[in-house]
Amino acid sequence: TQGVSAIRFVYEHNYPVIRDTIVSSVYARSIGKEVDGNAPELFGNELAAHIICGGPDVSCHETTTKKEAVEKLRYGVYMLMREGSTQRNMPECIRAITEEVLDSRRAILATDDMLAGDIATKGHMNDIIRRTIKEGVDPAEAIQMATINPATWLGLSELGVLAPGKLADIAVVEGELADMNVSEVFLSGQLVAKDRQLLLPLPAYQYPDIVKHSVKRKPVKPEDLMVKCDKSNPKVNCIGLILDQNLTDAFVEDMKAEDGYVKPDIENDLLPIANVGRHGQSDIGAGFVKGFKMKQGAFA
């Protein structure tokens, strides 16, 4: 599990992160600002401590199991059920509501990261609402999880419902509500999309110069991305991908080394991975990961 044990680990290796986080969190609370974060795999006393530090509206978008979802909802955590292109946690989390019949007012639908192609072909929030309904949630309740629930969590009392005195952008759904086929979109009272066609010009975004020169990095050599080793048959700590999850497995693998470096093992899907800082850091984190199943090439 994470939590206190993770804090100790980070403190041992990079104590300024913990120190700065505590100082900034205390300052934010002192001036009336919200403090929030994630709470993956937290239960019992550790979850309670996280909530006390975060305040009454603390949230988590890293919940991955029904057990976690049940406890967080019972503790009053706003649970953002993630269902994006690569992280798919909603079907497991929603069981806390469909099977345990818990109150859904603190359940929120979220996509986190979505590929542009997925948004174009499947939709965005309308797609996750559609999937939630297929998991057994009433259509009106599923829509609340994407509208009034997040508005309430963020303190945006003027948003989230169609009612006098409220602000609302409107998505018109055609046919069965459960299908979530959006036919028209109104933005600030103006019809901006109809039948999947944009009705107003959308100029290309102009990036400011400051973001065009933000990478501060010395040239990286191939050996900088490799794991040094003085043994010929080392035992190597590896990362294991979990399908549709952000969390990963950790395991030890017998590997081979030559010329002072551990060799990748493509046949067994043990591929090199590196974390290269872009803000002036000199250190590089290098290791091995299993699960990509790539036989050639690379990506960044």
Sequence positions of predicted segments:
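An acidic- and aromatic-residue-enriched active-site/binding cleft used to recognize and process polar
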Residues: P40, G84-S85, D112, G175-E176, ...
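Acidic, glycine-rich active-site loops and adjacent beta-strand->loop/helix elements
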Residues: S85-Q87, N149-P150
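Flexible glycine-/small-residue-rich
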Residues: Q2, T111, N275
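Active-site microenvironment of metallo-dependent hydrolases
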Residues: A120-G136, A140-A300
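A short glycine-threonine-serine/GTX helix/turn-capping micro-motif
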Residues: M114-I119
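Histidine/acidic residue-rich metal-binding segments in metalloenzymes
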Residues: G3, F9-M81, R88-L109, A120-K134, ...
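Mobile "lid/hinge" segments at catalytic clefts and subdomain interfaces of large enzymes
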Residues: T1-V4, S188
